[in-house]
Amino acid sequence: MAQHSKYSDAQLSAIVNDMIAVLEKHKAPVDLSLIALGNMASNLLTTSVPQTQREALAQAFSNSLINAVKTR
């Protein structure tokens, strides 16, 4: 999703590939996969981001996701 990142493509690819492997292992259909990923994002926001920044970060993430699917 992000065009510029402080993380390497290799780091991101390794994590994404692991996450895809888990979803495939469980034969998760698209809707279940999206629910699981949404729950993961919500959990990360509520456990790792100060409450004062959560909504703005969630909005930025949402905008980035929307832009990513528009360009594909």
Curated annotation (Swiss-Prot):
Belongs to the UPF0352 family. It comes from the Bacteria. This is UPF0352 protein CGSHiEE_07850. It comes from Haemophilus influenzae (strain PittEE). SUPFAM superfamilies: YejL-like. It holds the Pfam family DUF1414. Gene3D superfamilies: YejL-like. InterPro entries: UPF0352 (IPR009857), YejL_sf (IPR023202).
